[in-house]
Amino acid sequence: MVQTKICGLKTPEGVTAALDGGAAFIGFNMFPASPRYISAEDAARLAPPARGRTRIVAVTVDPDDAFLDRLMTSLRPDLIQLHGRETPTRAAAIAARTGAEVIKALPVSDASDVDTAAPFDAAVTHLMFDAKAPAGAAFPGGHGVAFDWSVLKGRRFSRPWFLAGGLDPWNVAEAIGGAGAPMVDVSSGVERGPGIKDPALISAFLEAVRRA
């Protein structure tokens, strides 16, 4: 069964919709430039209903050690997603410092970008293939942009992986088939405005994944 991560949650209603729909992961975006930004402390206040029902992911961009220490004291996520320019060495150091599992997000525009995953095999527990952000974008991910899913079809990776980028309730089944994805990640595709999650769209997305 394909697993789903609902990312960029900011409200109790969004968290509830994700939990009720059976999301395997929920994500809180810690990057201040994103319209989905939430502080670690505010995310910690939303997290209690999720513990034991799903896995909590902190989405970060080039986090420093001081931030990581604060994150592990407040939110205590199960996984840390790295969505910046982190190297395999830095990713491994983050895993060792925090004790959390680590997702490395990799920007993709064509098949050659998929090959950038290999150096992270020994450093992280999960991979994510996300559409490359538009030129000049202030933040990575969450732009509602897709890439050619077929560049992932038939590829084998040593780590579990997520497909992300431009997914929504209407195209996720096609995306899963086109990429052969074992896990999917959605953010802007379940919003009614930038950073504003729609519980009905969250439910529809999770149902579409179940039916895929």
Segments (PLM) and residue ranges:
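Conserved N-terminal beta1-alpha1 strand-loop-helix module at the mouth
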Residues: 1-183, 188-212
